[in-house]
Structure formats: C-alpha cells, structure tokens
C-alpha cells in the first residue's frame, strides 16, 4: 500500500506554528543563608586557616567588592565538620562531595520544578521533555532520571542530561528547549538548572587566588522553566518568547575559565582578563543578534546577563554605554544569591517579570518589547538569546 503522506507533510505536521514561549518559572534555594559580611571569618575558621592572616585580608577585600549581600549554601558548619577533607585545599574528598550532590542536586531541582509546574497549572502528564543541567557532580542514571521519578513524570518523557557545562549553560538550556518546543508540536519542555557548591568548596591557598574568587562568589540555587510553543491562552500564561538563540567561542580566550574534576573536587581556574574578554566581544554578539530586527540601541532592550561577578557587569555596561537600570534585575540577583552558575539567568528572568508587574510596567520586560539574555562561561563560551516580552495586561505575571 502506498504512503498517503509525504515526508514533508509529516514534518509540517510535527512542527509548531509559533515561537517557543516561557510559560512558567520557579526557583529554590537551600534553607542555609550565609551573609557575605560574615563569610570571611566563617570560611577561614571552618577551613582552619586563620593563621593565613594576609590571605584572609585579601579574601575580605574580595567579598567586600563582590556586591553580594548574601548567598544560600547546602553546606552547613555541621556538614563541613563531619567532612574535614572538604575543608582542606588538596585532600581527597570527591566521594564525600558526590554523596552529597547526587542526592541534593535533584532534590533542589524538584523544589524549583514544583513551583514552575504549580504556576503553569497543567497536569504533569503534559510534560513531554525534560532538560536537566548541573555543574555539580556526575552520576548514572543522572539527575534527570532522579527528577523524573521524584516528580512522577511519565516514564516516556524525553530526557536530556547536561553535566559540567558551567555558567553559560542557562542560555544553552533555553536554546535547546526552543528547538525542542518548536520542532515538536504540542511539546512542553521542563527545564531545570540545579547547582550545589559542595563540589567546589575547598580551603584557601596562597598559590591559587582564582580559587578564592570562586569561594567569594558561588552560591547554591535551582531554577525551572516550562517552555512550549502555541500556548493555549485559555489555561496558559506566556511570560517571554524565545526569538533566536546562538552560541559562540570568544577569540583568544582559551584557558580564561576552566574547571577540572579531581579527587579534591571541582577545581576552579580563572584568568584576570575575563571581564575584558567578554566586554571586548559583547557588541559583536549584540549586533549579530539584533541586526535582523533593525535594533542597534542597547538601552532600548531589557537585559538578563549572567552575573559572573561585578567586574564583568561593570565593563559590559561601560562598553555599550548602558544605563544603570538596564542591569537592575541582574545586580539584584547577584546581591541576593551570588553566582549560582547555570541557574542565574533564570533567577534574573523571574525577578524581571515580577518586578515589571510590581512597578506597573506594560510588559514583562520592564516595559520594553525586546530583550537579550547572555550566558558567559568556560571556553570562553557565550550564549545569546533574543527575547520578546508579553503585555502584563494579558495576565503574564505570577
């Protein structure tokens, strides 16, 4: 019997009509809150490093300049006292770290996912795809499998597990979810980024100041979004449309940010020129993303930028002459949570849509229609996502 449909007809039936859309956002942190003003004393005490007075003063200056007010960490004083090797600089401790993150990464991801699913308001059986991202540990079956079981998702949900990507990956997961949603009619993609610093926490050492930068910046957090095309406006509330997404490796940036999984945990290596490398290339990324739209004024778009640290934000602002309010949501999340790696940009997206409603703006993007989301991380890799906001009057806020 001859086929009644062509391949082209099958493909057209499989594709969505409209762009991928963020339909819900949820975030979660551990209960343990650490205030930055107190952290240097705590960190040098718990790592038994108070004798390193000069290094402690350097660390205090790092924390003072970080623009971070507080962070959340699963690692408590009690956990660290039970695992002294995690407090050393070079002691073998990977097994202890793995035992923690294998359990806690999916658990924190579940808390964020439950909030997103509640806001979405649809049955979990409608989730067709799961994208899970973490830089915290590796395991088989992965955190995607664990979360599928925890949430009671269908066993046939199509899963993608992303381990060890780093800070740019909040953009990566949106790019992947966009492709999944737009190429699978009716797809609803649950995206989860969950990060626990138990894999990177370690004691100080005079020869490794870039490791101290990480100790001053990193915090724990998980964020989840639900993404789908062609939303059913009778039951779903769009928040942002994902218009385009791209990834690039910056020229002459090899070795600028590295992470290596070793017996001592995930070690962090950073070159001083990271803010310069990013700011030098930011305008090109913006031009390539917005030229098709005829946009070349960077204060006319809303900004969601991975808050790798204040120096990166300062130099990007200076390079493209940004008004201070453009980075308000980004700097707020930096202040209140620190650097949560892949989860950061989703926290910022959540902050932006909530504050836009509170401040009486017309759209979820601080009153503007178009926006940009940047992920920066190892490579140096940059993810660029062009967003379109939706009118708040359409019920687009949580």
Curated annotation (Swiss-Prot):
Pfam families for this protein: Chal_sti_synt_C, Chal_sti_synt_N
InterPro entries membership: Chalcone/stilbene_synt_C, Chalcone/stilbene_synt_N, Chalcone/stilbene_synthase_AS, Polyketide_synthase_type-III, Thiolase-like
Enzyme class: transferase
Coiled-coil stretches noted in the UniProt entry, renumbered to this chain: none
The enzyme's E.C. designation: 2.3.1.74
Superkingdom of origin: Eukaryota
Keywords from the named record: Acyltransferase, Flavonoid biosynthesis, Transferase
GO BP of this protein: flavonoid biosynthetic process; polyketide biosynthetic process
Catalysed transformations (reactions): (E)-4-coumaroyl-CoA + 3 malonyl-CoA + 3 H(+) = 2',4,4',6'-tetrahydroxychalcone + 3 CO2 + 4 CoA
CDD domains associated with the record: CHS_like
A GO MF term: naringenin-chalcone synthase activity
Residue numbers annotated as active site: 167
Gene3D superfamilies cross-referenced by the UniProt entry: 3.40.47.10
Pathway: Secondary metabolite biosynthesis; flavonoid biosynthesis
Family: Belongs to the thiolase-like superfamily. Chalcone/stilbene synthases family.
Role: The primary product of this enzyme is 4,2',4',6'-tetrahydroxychalcone (also termed naringenin-chalcone or chalcone) which can under specific conditions spontaneously isomerize into naringenin.
Name recorded for this polypeptide: Chalcone synthase 1
The species this protein was found in: Hordeum vulgare
Lineage: Eukaryota, Viridiplantae, Streptophyta, Embryophyta, Tracheophyta
Gene: CHS1
């Amino acid at each position: 019997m001859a086929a009644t449909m062509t391949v082209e007809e099958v493909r057209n039936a499989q594709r969505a009509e409209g762009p991928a859309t963020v339909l819900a956002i949820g975030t979660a942190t551990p209960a343990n809150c650490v205030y930055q003003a107190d952290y240097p004393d705590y960190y040098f005490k718990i790592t038994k490093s108070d004798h390193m007075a000069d290094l402690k003063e350097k660390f205090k200056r790092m924390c003072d300049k970080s623009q971070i007010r507080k962070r959340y960490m699963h690692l408590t004083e009690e956990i660290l006292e039970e695992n002294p090797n995690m407090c050393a600089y070079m002691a073998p401790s990977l097994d202890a770290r793995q035992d923690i993150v294998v359990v806690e990464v999916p658990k924190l991801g579940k808390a964020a996912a439950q909030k997103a699913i509640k806001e979405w308001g649809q049955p979990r059986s409608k989730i067709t795809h799961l994208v899970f991202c973490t830089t915290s540990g590796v395991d088989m079956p992965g955190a995607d499998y664990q979360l599928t079981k925890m949430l009671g998702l269908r066993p046939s949900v199509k899963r993608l597990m992303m381990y060890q990507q780093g800070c740019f990956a909040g953009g990566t997961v949106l790019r992947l979810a966009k492709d999944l949603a737009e190429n699978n009619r009716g797809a609803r993609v649950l995206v989860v980024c969950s990060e626990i610093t138990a894999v990177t926490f370690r004691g100080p050492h005079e020869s490794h100041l870039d490791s101290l930068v990480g100790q001053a910046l990193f915090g724990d957090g998980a964020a989840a979004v639900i993404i789908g095309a062609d939303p059913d406006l009778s039951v779903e509330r769009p928040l942002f449309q994902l218009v385009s997404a791209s990834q690039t490796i910056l020229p002459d940036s090899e070795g600028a940010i590295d992470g290596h999984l070793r017996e001592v945990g995930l070690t962090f290596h950073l070159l001083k020129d990271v803010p310069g490398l990013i700011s030098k290339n930011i305008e090109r990324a913006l031009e390539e993303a917005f030229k098709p739209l005829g946009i070349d004024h960077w204060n006319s778009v809303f900004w969601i930028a991975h808050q790798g640290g204040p120096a990166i934000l300062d130099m990007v602002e200076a390079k493209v002459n940004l008004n201070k309010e453009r980075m308000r949501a980004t700097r707020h999340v930096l202040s209140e949570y620190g650097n949560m790696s892949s989860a950061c940009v989703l926290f910022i997206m959540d902050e932006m849509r909530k504050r836009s409603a509170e401040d009486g703006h017309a759209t979820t993007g601080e009153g503007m229609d178009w926006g940009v989301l940047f992920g920066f991380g190892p490579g140096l890799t940059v993810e660029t996502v062009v967003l379109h906001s939706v009118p708040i009057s359409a019920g687009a806020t949580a």
